[in-house]
Structures are given as C-alpha cells and as structure tokens.
Amino acid sequence: MPAQQWDSPPEMQIDETKNYSVSITTNRGTIELELYPQHAPQTVNNFVYLAGQGFYDGVLFHRVIPNFMIQGGDPTGSGSGGPGYRFADECDGNPLRHERCVISMANAGPNTNG
C-alpha cells in the first residue's frame, strides 16, 4: 500500500518552547530521542505530525552503515520517498551539530525537507 501523501506541510501544532521526547521501537531495541523545536520548529512539527499520522509505522531503516549511521523514515524504502511536500531548511543560526548520537533529517538538497 502506498504511503499517504499531503499537498503541503502541516500547520504548526507543537509548542516551540518545549522539548519533545520520542521513542522509536525496533526489533533491535528502542531508540530514545529528544527533539528541540526552538532550533528547528518546522522539522520537529513535521516529525511529530507524521508520527501521529502513522506515517512511520512499520518503516524499515533502509540504509545502515555500521558504526556510522542509520537512515529511515521513507515508507518506499528507496531513500527518496516522502510525504509529498517540501519545506525550507532550518540551519541558519542553529547551534546543533552532526555529532555521535544526533538525529538529523536527510533531504535531497537545499529546502527539500519533508
């Protein structure tokens, strides 16, 4: 069954002053995440919305590089699927960096988040 698609990003439904905790349950254990909307409000709102819609339910990590990274969130399993919309990058002024144990959103280039 194809993944659900939307025409535009969801309206803001989160409180940008709060941090959010997320648990991703896998067959290898549970991954606990903290999301920081004060640094990337659209990205956190997008993740919270799609998770609430069941968009990620049953989705596999389609790319695994041992001792480096895992990539998931694409219901097609190809690495190029998404919810049907895009939104702008939120990196300017963002103090968070790509370090060990950090979650980031992959995209297809500038302003192609979704």
Residue spans of the language-model regions?
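Cyclophilin-like peptidyl-prolyl cis-trans isomerases
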Residues: 1-114
